């Protein structure tokens, strides 16, 4: 009997796995993962992300091997690998999930589809989460999302019949793949076991103060679920997190204690973030061009890439802007691969408004840094925080205010900017204002030990607002804003276009 091929992509798990479940109904399964060098050559990829993928592949192989059929892992062009596998096994059906990724994966999928047609192979794609293909507007999207999330989860297979053992174990194949970069080495551990442990600890202890603690980087590191890279690689399903968190919330809703109220509020907030997760990926699924072009076409040409100051971009990448809290956030993200959503939004806003860097440049830098890079969320959010979507509030963050609000005692700053460790709290947010005598006293001379600020943040913000106001006043933006709202706007809120009518689009948080 010919095997059914299951192509693992960004769904590296065996629990609640639609493609694997339905493939098994047709016959013995040949599970396949292909490391594609072409993908890893893109600007938004990094060795940090590969480390997470590599660990997740090893974990998946261990689970599949335990069920009876090891993972076949190869390195190369997807079509060429499929051709070799077809020559050996003669499979006529292939299952995978529907992937919403960057243009590279979209073009690869088109090539795979053409190859399948040429070999008369049936390729069946399954939903990965709440993203809907072929959607023209958002009129019924939330209802459809809810139906997917509330559907019964699919159990892991009891066993997999052995089709054939691979020439090399998956761990040996991936061990010889090197994705080099200079500084991006820190990452969360990958694999389904890690994902399940994070979800359990979040629902049992860490998540109680999630709602109140997600904004500050001092607390977000602990109170957030930290599941975002696992959602990005599919080591756990969004549906699992949704159902487990809502079941836990239901247990607390009948209780009156302060603890129960905190838990109920936090888990409600967490559920909202799971909804927004799919909401933003849906934008890229519906309109793939937003990887390269402004969501609102009326902003094409606004903040042109030619105006990007390379010296500012370099200081941004190095975490040497001279604004301590911003530098601390940049260094934390660059070294660990994670930062809470509010601070990510601040970094993008600072790059876009204060430094006047084109959003594409920022997208490439931060894309490499994020362990949890998810193209749909990434490009949508970068544009949203850069003010080029046309339906969201334009927020120009005040770096010093954020510093004082989110890190009042300078603990986060001193952790990530050790040059300022001896600087008194009174000066740590604005060390350039510190008297020279005090600089000598604490051993931190501005301009020598820590850089002069890249500019006056208040003045730079003022200039950015003036540019934005001038663009809006000299361009007809309302018609395109209506189109964007119809195609991409959430129906859970009474959002309005930013131009032509009064806007009402609150800032969203995607921390999970």
Language-model features: locations:
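Active-site "lid/cap" and pocket-lining segments within catalytic core domains
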Residues: 1-271, 281, 389-512
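Active-site-proximal binding-pocket segments
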Residues: 226-426
